[in-house]
Amino acid sequence: MVKIGKLQFMWKDANSRTGNCPGLHRVTDGTEGYVVVGKSTDPGVRAMIAEIGDDETAVFVPANVLDRLRGQ
């Protein structure tokens, strides 16, 4: 489990109108990184990922959530 002290909301799925939507947060506690919020995937997706740890998970987010990072 990764411990994170502070997050800064960056943006959400461009097609979302309300809460409960995929989004991206920047870690702002001195650790460089991001937290991605997305929909849980089914076990079949997890099985397709070659290397995934027992303490890791796979989530789906629309491409527009992460594509915006290129413009940063």
Task: List the model feature ranges, each with a label.
Residues 1-18:
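Short, charged/polar N-terminal "headpieces" of proteins
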Residues 6, 23, 65-68:
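Acidic/proline-rich low-complexity IDRs
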Residues 11, 37-38, 63:
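Pocket-edge structural micro-motifs
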Residues 16-56:
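A short, structured beta-strand/loop element
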Residues 47-72:
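C-terminal structural segments of small proteins and small subunits
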